[in-house]
A protein has these predicted regions:
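Long, compositionally biased intrinsically disordered regions
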Residues: 1-106, 110, 281, 288-301
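Generic detection of short hydrophobic beta-strand segments and adjacent strand-loop junctions
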Residues: 5-21, 169-187, 251, 256-260
Length: 384
């Protein structure tokens, strides 16, 4: 039975942006406005999380109905409930200083994550806090006048760039090598073929990135809903998969399996980077101080970032290859076999002071990427 699945899904693309203004003083003022909005977003997020936590934990003598009617001190006007109290407090504190649409989006994100944390169990972790690297969301209508136009770069060459205006600030996108096809997606957004959703700005040092969220149609793929691709996530071989049910039950037989990646390919380079980190930690003892911790640990942070980037790239590649195998064999479902058992075993080894597996192999990141790429083509992903 062939099933043709076609739905829409929201994808996120990371694109570098910068203020497009020739006047030096005006450009500086625009950047100050962006960073001030970022600081306000961080304050609003932490304030909202604190308010929600206080309402849930500091008034045990009140009934649930009374908690919904509690108002905050200092809020003028009508009484505010638990749902809209954070927005009322934020509007009183920051109205006129930042875009209130951005403030509303921040509050919605914080409330959603707070409710998710409550379901998982607040006692299992500390209250979520927000720092300066958090994405600052803006409504899609705030990204005005999105268009492509010719411009002259610093070398006098004519190029075509993408320009838009965000809360009165002229900005331009920098696509770079564009191996992910971001320019094509933005062109379709500008033409009206794709719908732009609430997107965010993320500040990374001196760079600003646009986390562009776009509602795109899923790829039309003919899949057999009854056909299943069985996959094992392992350390020796990152992914082993098969469409044969008998082979899936006889994992150790080594027959009829398709292997994705090798232990040497993934772990060897990662262990090299970890060795660089260890050397930096040792050498930091002998470096000259007096210029701050950030300067002293600069090399260490560099290699930490390299390791994260390497792991993310590899997991993207492995998950892409697994979904391609499922599409090739027209499998409508991917089953991760014995995955829960393997994760429990890894946790036990970690508790026995043998942290190699969880330290060097990323079960959770790989699972999330497989599910994300599977949804793009209509493939269901399940665990056993």
């Amino acid at each position: 039975m062939d099933v043709k699945k076609k739905n829409n899904m929201v994808i996120t693309r990371k694109i570098e942006v910068f203020v497009c203004e020739d006047d030096k003083d005006l450009r500086k003022a625009y950047y100050e406005k962006l960073y001030a909005s970022r600081d306000i977003a961080v304050k609003v997020a932490n304030m909202c999380a604190s308010h929600l936590f206080a309402l849930d934990n500091t008034m045990p003598y009140l009934s649930d109905e009374d908690k919904e009617k509690v108002t905050f001190l200092g809020v003028s006007g009508d009484a505010s409930t638990k749902r809209n109290a954070p927005y009322v407090a934020a509007s009183e504190a920051f109205k006129g200083q930042a875009d209130m649409g951005m403030v509303s989006c921040v509050l919605q994100n914080v409330q959603k994550m707070y409710q998710d944390d409550r379901k998982k169990g607040m006692w299992a972790r500390s209250l979520r806090s927000y720092k300066s690297n958090m994405p600052v969301p803006y409504q899609a209508k705030r990204f005005a006048n999105l268009h492509f136009a010719e411009y002259t770069n610093g070398n006098g060459e004519k190029r075509e760039g993408c320009f838009f205006t965000l809360t009165g600030i002229p900005m331009q996108m920098r696509f770079g090598r564009d191996r992910s096809g971001n320019r094509t997606i933005v062109e379709r957004v500008a033409d009206g073929d794709y719908k732009m959703c609430t997107s965010s700005l993320q500040f990374d040092g001196k760079k600003i990135f646009l986390l562009l969220c776009v509602d795109v149609p899923k790829k039309e793929v003919k899949l057999d809903a009854k056909k299943i691709l069985f996959a094992y996530l392992d350390v020796d071989v990152p992914i082993r998969c098969t469409t044969d049910v008998k082979a899936a039950k006889e994992y150790d037989s080594g027959m009829k399996w398709f292997e994705i990646g090798t232990k040497e390919e993934f772990l060897y380079r990662r262990r090299q980077i970890q060795e660089f980190v260890r050397r930096c930690q040792i050498n930091n003892k002998y470096t000259t101080g007096g210029k701050g911790r950030k300067k002293k640990c600069q090399a260490l942070e560099h290699w930490h970032e390299k390791e994260l980037n390497y792991v993310g790239t590899k997991l993207h590649m492995y998950s892409r290859m697994l979904v391609d195998v499922a599409m090739k064999h027209k499998c409508g479902k991917i089953v991760l076999v014995n995955q829960k058992e393997r994760e429990e075993k890894a946790k036990e080894e970690n508790m026995r002071c043998e942290p190699f597996l969880l330290r060097n192999w990323s079960y959770y990141g790989l699972k999330d990427k497989i599910k994300y790429k599977g949804r793009m083509v209509g493939i269901e992903v399940a665990e056993e």
